[in-house]
């Protein structure tokens, strides 16, 4: 009986965590193309976002690394912007299990 309760509790906790992923804020809120330093660090804040894997599909932008912090509500996303990157809305995909959340991040001229 204890094993069943433990299993059920673990399952319910995983469902809560799975359903809770959202993004409240990304800092800085936008960035400029053509900067001297091609590296961009984004601090992503949102409930449960620390469990997510991250991908970027935008010409001239590559994902350098993702750092998970002690708090499950923060992620640091490091991007490399080529000199040729064009201004626009860059989709960043956050994935936990089968759930995907796409947030557009603006690159300005």
Can you annotate each of these PLM segments?
Residues 1-4:
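Positively charged n-region of N-terminal signal peptides that target proteins for export
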Residues 37-97:
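Immunoglobulin-like IPT/TIG beta-sandwich domains and homologous Ig-like subdomains
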Residues 18-20, 66-67:
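Short amphipathic alpha-helical segments, especially helix-boundary/capping motifs
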Residues 9, 28-30, 92:
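Short non-domain terminal segments
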Residues 7-16:
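Bacterial N-terminal signal peptides
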Residues 20-51, 99-109:
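Beta-strand/beta-sandwich contexts
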Residues 16-17, 33, 93-95:
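Residue-identity detector for threonine
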């Amino acid at each position: 009986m204890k094993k069943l309760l433990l299993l059920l509790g673990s399952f319910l906790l995983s469902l809560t965590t799975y359903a809770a992923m959202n993004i409240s804020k990304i800092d800085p809120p936008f960035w400029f193309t053509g900067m001297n330093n091609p590296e961009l660090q984004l601090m992503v804040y949102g409930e449960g976002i620390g469990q997510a894997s991250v991908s970027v599909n935008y010409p001239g932008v590559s994902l350098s690394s993702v750092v998970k912090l002690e708090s499950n509500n923060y992620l640091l996303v490091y991007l490399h912007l080529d000199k040729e990157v064009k201004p626009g809305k860059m989709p960043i995909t956050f994935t936990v299990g089968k759930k995907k959340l796409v947030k557009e991040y603006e690159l300005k001229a």
